[in-house]
Amino acid sequence: MTRSLKKNPFVANHLLEKVEKLNMREEKKIIVTWSRSSTIIPTMIGHTIAIHNGREHLPIYITDRMVGHKLGEFAPTLTFRGHARNDNRSRR
């Protein structure tokens, strides 16, 4: 179910403050965050945000096509290592 249109998109306060501060200074630094549930808003375009995936922070450059999506969508938490091998030879 999607978020109600009456509500504003969720962005963590600390993340929003960091983005606004960098926009005021016109700096481009990497912003480190654990807030995967924050929505990408237009003021974040052009910044690099390091999103935590449970093990490390992955730097993601924010473009205009990402607006409206959540930060966690761009930092996968699982690594697929392949299906289990079918070991019929060793069972004989």
Swiss-Prot record:
Keyword Ribonucleoprotein assigned: yes
Keyword tags: Chloroplast, Plastid, Ribonucleoprotein, Ribosomal protein, RNA-binding, rRNA-binding
Gene symbol of the encoding locus: rps19
GO MF term list: rRNA binding; structural constituent of ribosome
Entry annotated with the keyword Zinc: no
Stored PANTHER family: RIBOSOMAL PROTEIN S19P FAMILY MEMBER, SMALL RIBOSOMAL SUBUNIT PROTEIN US19M
Membership in a protein family: Belongs to the universal ribosomal protein uS19 family.
Family annotation (InterPro entries): Ribosomal_uS19 (IPR002222), Ribosomal_uS19_bac-type (IPR005732), Ribosomal_uS19_CS (IPR020934), Ribosomal_uS19_SF (IPR023575)
Any single Pfam family the record assigns to this protein: Ribosomal_S19
Protein name according to UniProt: Small ribosomal subunit protein uS19c
GO process annotations (BP): ribosomal small subunit assembly; translation
Single GO cellular component term: chloroplast
Compartment(s): Plastid, Chloroplast
Lineage: superkingdom: Eukaryota
The organism of origin for this protein: Chloranthus spicatus (Chulantree)
Function in brief: Protein S19 forms a complex with S13 that binds strongly to the 16S ribosomal RNA.
